[in-house]
């Protein structure tokens, strides 16, 4: 078995997690109390969904997940919500006081007290797996818990489970919409550890997803529930090949093999198509070629950056539903001929495709239409550097005046950590710049260095 353990940290991580588990349950026909009427074998069979759920002797299916927050309100919603019976009480870990949007509180003072408990619970989940494949980590880097405790947990996971792959689904601050003043600090400090301790990070950004909801689903004022349901479709498509059988299955470890050319360059853009409301769906023919094209549209990207400004290094297309390899090959061939979609010249093939026969499921009363086929794209593009340069710029403006720094120093950080993290990100921007440069030009310069 190739089990995956999901770790949801902080408010953003937990709320995205709620949307994901709600969707997984619907996809597998698991009721909110964990019973699965269609599953006749008691105890673990070899069905594919055991990658995400474990089964008790009483026939109850329990998610292989853990929810952590430093303050109780968000986790209490899970404890009292529709799916309260789904989770084992020990999987929901909440502290008493908030990280207060402060990376240092999440990482040093308050996070330190709770991290061993989390690792203990993760250890129990891991012992329950026959062949643990890796971790999916959900968090946001703007707040205190997601950034501070999130990076602390990742660092500790690297120590305890060094070889297991870690996929991050990370909510980054948006260009215009801000939820806290110190977002740039938290993001830079947190990215510093994401760089080292995740294998692949998928960037999400609320503003980009708001725009998709507003434009494609005609929701005038999208709520976080709307956003999370869209994000959960992406994550479900990514993990569908682990949970269902298909023609071309994609493994979690395959993402890192196919998408990451150099260890540091592992921040991905994601997009999903078709994002379409029920009213429109009946009037459109959504062929494989069409959904593939719309997945490459800059407006479909779930982070605010324009892939036309950069080059693609690799991309992974996960199709689900009524899709055959012939259509996929034709669609990919068309994409390759487009002028607007440029690939780095050292990566001529650049496509990894997966096909899964399970059509996309929609949440009843949700915004998305039920469609026959969908595609989710995870791409590694040099334009992601825009996200970092935007945050770095805001960081510099504040840090030049040392604004708000005393809150971090007071919780046991040193100013040196700020400059170290900032230098690391400057190096990352430089890395992206170099990877995007044409290799033909690079060859002439290198010849001078050889002795």
Curated annotation (Swiss-Prot):
Role of this protein: Tubulin is the major constituent of microtubules, a cylinder consisting of laterally associated linear protofilaments composed of alpha- and beta-tubulin heterodimers. Microtubules grow by the addition of GTP-tubulin dimers to the microtubule end, where a stabilizing cap forms. Below the cap, tubulin dimers are in GDP-bound state, owing to GTPase activity of alpha-tubulin.
In the record, biological process GO terms are: microtubule cytoskeleton organization; mitotic cell cycle
Q: Which cofactor does it need?
A: Mg(2+)
- Subcellular localization, as worded in the UniProt entry: Cytoplasm, Cytoskeleton
**Highest taxon in the source lineage:** Eukaryota
**A GO molecular-function descriptor:** metal ion binding
Task: Give the record's subunit note.
Answer: Dimer of alpha and beta chains. A typical microtubule is a hollow water-filled tube with an outer diameter of 25 nm and an inner diameter of 15 nM. Alpha-beta heterodimers associate head-to-tail to form protofilaments running lengthwise along the microtubule wall with the beta-tubulin subunit facing the microtubule plus end conferring a structural polarity. Microtubules usually have 13 protofilaments but different protofilament numbers can be found in some organisms and specialized cells.
User: In its UniProt entry, what is this protein called?
Assistant: Tubulin alpha-1 chain
What protein family is recorded? Answer: Belongs to the tubulin family.
EC nos: 3.6.5.-
InterPro entries according to UniProt: Alpha_tubulin (IPR002452), Tub_FtsZ_C (IPR008280), Tubulin (IPR000217), Tubulin/FtsZ-like_C (IPR037103), Tubulin/FtsZ_2-layer-sand-dom (IPR018316), Tubulin/FtsZ_GTPase_sf (IPR036525), Tubulin_C (IPR023123), Tubulin_CS (IPR017975)
This protein's species is Gossypium hirsutum (Upland cotton)
Instruction: Report the residues modified as N6-acetyllysine.
Output: 40
Coiled-coil regions listed in the entry: none
Q: Where is this region: Disordered?
A: 432-451
The keyword Nucleotide-binding is annotated on this UniProt entry: yes
* Pfam annotation, one family: Tubulin
| Assigned keywords, A-Z | Acetylation, Cytoplasm, Cytoskeleton, GTP-binding, Hydrolase, Magnesium, Metal-binding, Microtubule, Nucleotide-binding
Binding of Mg(2+), residues? 71
């Amino acid at each position: 078995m190739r089990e995956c353990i999901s770790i949801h940290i902080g408010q953003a991580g937990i709320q995205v997690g709620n949307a994901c588990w709600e969707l997984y349950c619907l996809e597998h026909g698991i009721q909110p109390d964990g019973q699965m009427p269609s599953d006749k074998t008691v105890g673990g069979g070899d069905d594919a969904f055991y990658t995400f759920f474990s089964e008790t002797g009483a026939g109850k299916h329990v998610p292989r997940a853990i929810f952590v927050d430093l303050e109780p309100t968000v986790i209490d919603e899970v404890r009292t919500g529709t799916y309260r019976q789904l989770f084992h009480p020990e999987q929901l870990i909440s502290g008493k006081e908030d990280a207060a949007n402060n990376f240092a509180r999440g990482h040093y003072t308050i996070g330190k007290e709770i991290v061993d408990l989390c690792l203990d619970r993760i250890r129990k989940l891991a012992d329950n797996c026959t062949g643990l494949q890796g971790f999916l980590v959900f968090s946001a880097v703007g707040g205190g818990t997601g950034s501070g405790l999130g990076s602390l947990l990742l660092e500790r996971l690297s120590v305890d489970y060094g070889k297991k792959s870690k996929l991050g689904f990370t909510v980054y601050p948006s260009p215009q919409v801000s939820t806290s003043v110190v977002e740039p600090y938290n993001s830079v400090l947190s990215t510093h550890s994401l760089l080292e301790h995740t294998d692949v990070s998928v960037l999400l950004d609320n503003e980009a997803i708001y725009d998709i909801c507003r434009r494609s689903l005609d929701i005038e004022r999208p709520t976080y529930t709307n956003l999370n349901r869209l994000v959960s479709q992406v994550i479900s498509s990514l993990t569908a090949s682990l949970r269902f059988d298909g023609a071309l299955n994609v493994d979690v470890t395959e993402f890192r093999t196919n998408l990451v050319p150099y260890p540091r360059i592992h921040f991905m853009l994601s997009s999903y198509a078709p994002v379409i409301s029920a009213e429109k769906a009946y009037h459109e023919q959504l062929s494989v070629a069409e959904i593939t094209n719309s997945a490459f549209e800059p407006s479909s990207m779930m982070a605010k950056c324009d892939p036309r400004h950069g080059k693609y290094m690799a991309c992974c297309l996960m199709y689900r539903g009524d899709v055959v390899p012939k259509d996929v090959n034709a669609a990919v061939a068309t994409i390759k001929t487009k002028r607007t979609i440029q690939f780095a010249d050292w990566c001529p093939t650049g496509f990894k495709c997966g096909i899964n026969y399970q059509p996309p499921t929609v949440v009843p009363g949700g915004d998305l239409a039920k469609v026959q086929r969908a595609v989710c794209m995870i791409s590694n593009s040099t334009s992601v550097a825009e996200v970092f340069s935007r945050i770095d710029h805001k960081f510099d403006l504040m840090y030049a005046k040392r604004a708000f720094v005393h809150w971090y120093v007071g919780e046991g950080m040193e100013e040196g950590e700020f400059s170290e993290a900032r230098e690391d990100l400057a190096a990352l921007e430089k890395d992206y710049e170099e990877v995007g440069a044409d290799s033909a030009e690079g060859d002439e310069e290198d010849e001078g260095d050889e002795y």
